[in-house]
């Protein structure tokens, strides 16, 4: 038995009532910038690793 659409809507409504839309919006933007920073650091690490490997050979 999974969670139905109605149950998800009720949970979403309760979360919005508890935290408010402004706080949730701020949390979403903070999470998005954290994910972008993580992706950038991973891609920078791969670039550095590839540059080190090519300089060694």
From Swiss-Prot:
Gene3D superfamilies: 1.20.5.3310. It is a single-pass membrane protein. The chain crosses the membrane at residues 1-21. It is found in: Cell inner membrane. The Tat system comprises two distinct complexes: a TatABC complex, containing multiple copies of TatA, TatB and TatC subunits, and a separate TatA complex, containing only TatA subunits. Substrates initially bind to the TatABC complex, which probably triggers association of the separate TatA complex to form the active translocon. PANTHER family: SEC-INDEPENDENT PROTEIN TRANSLOCASE PROTEIN TATA. This is Sec-independent protein translocase protein TatA. It comes from Stutzerimonas stutzeri.
């Amino acid at each position: 038995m999974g969670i139905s659409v109605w149950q998800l809507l009720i949970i979403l409504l309760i979360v919005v009532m508890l935290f408010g839309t402004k706080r949730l919006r701020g949390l979403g933007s903070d999470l998005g910038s954290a994910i972008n920073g993580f992706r950038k650091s991973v891609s920078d690490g791969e670039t550095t690793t590839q540059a080190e490997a090519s300089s060694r050979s």
